Amino acid sequence: LTLAMTGIGLAHFISIEMVSIWIGLYILFYWQQFFKKEVLWALAKAAGLTLLWLAFYLLPVAEQMKNQVFKVTSNPLTYISERSYPIVSLFINSLKSSVFHAKTANLGTLLFVGLVVAVVSLASKKIQNKRFIGLTLVLLLMVTTLFPWHLLNHTPLNTIQFPWRFLGILSVMLAFFIAQDEWGVFRKSWTMALLVFLAVSNLGIYQYQSIQSQQGRLLTKAEYEQPAPFYIGAGHEYLPDEINYQELLKQKKRPLDYSAEQVTITNVRMPYGKISFDYQVVKQSAKVTVPFIYYLGYQATIQMKNQTGAKKMSLTNQGGLAALSLSGTGHVDIRYQRTKVQKIGTMITLLSVGGFGFSRFLQQKKKHKIKEQR
């Protein structure tokens, strides 16, 4: 469980939330198996170890969220209640195996048939695993407008953004239900051949529909080599709240922002991820804003005569960029440097992974000795 949850966390942070919800529901549906001391202790250890292994990732995220306000909380891209589907639309799109878009996500024809069979199975005495079917129906409900997502719009669960993301888990569950074949449908060779035929033909139809529906998105080579930033990756909601994204796009080359009456700046260099320049402050102090979107960790190394010191960057209230207050004469190097929390998180992860590996090694060594003694 630890390995699986760690892998999911590294692949997609939001998926941790969804899988955790699924695990919680699974435990509730099968509470008789889980509400035992040894099982609960095993789950607690797995959860704790997962947090330790992901400390290098989770602690920096928590630090950034605590340090400043991001659009994901102040101005979210969407509210989760706005992205759920009417159940009728979900069924129609599934029957048609509609090409996937945010408004047409569906189960596909075969899995939808499996869903219908699962619902019908609830009335049969032959079917043993009715709780599993019940859990499947709860996940289906969570995708639709029947679920009260509006109550969760202003909670951390809003970061899931799109309820149809649960269709991934739902699809795996339905595939598992079909593979169990409690009705004994696939014990005959011809039914297995029919299933393979339906799967292949359904795939062919879906591919044809995909090509036909995307004709308007065909690009020339020149257009392909100059993609819009949105197609590379959006993520606007993880910008600082002060950032005006549209204004930022208009200025492809952002110079240093300062008052020439207060400070003279020369020898400006801007290689990737770094800015350096010489400065001479005319008055007591001067503020210089650099073209870096502010995140905790940007730091300036200032050289003044025979002294060298480090200074943290600050957040500008206008524009959300990183700023620096200077005095005297000197040279500045600005770049992102790992914070103490990031270093501690990395150390926790390395120690926990190393400790786990060492303990497993000792366990295997002990087992090997016991076998030799026998």
State the predicted function of each range:
Residues 1, 9, 162, 223-235, ...:
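Proteins with a high burden of low-complexity, intrinsically disordered sequence enriched in S/T/G/P/A and R
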Residues 52, 159, 219, 226, ...:
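Alpha-helical structural elements
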Residues 1-211, 331-335, 341-374:
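Membrane-embedded transmembrane-helix bundle of lipid-linked glycan/lipid transferases
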Residues 247-374:
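Active-site-proximal, structured, solvent-exposed surfaces of multi-pass membrane proteins
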Residues 211-264:
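Membrane-interface segments at or immediately adjacent to transmembrane helices
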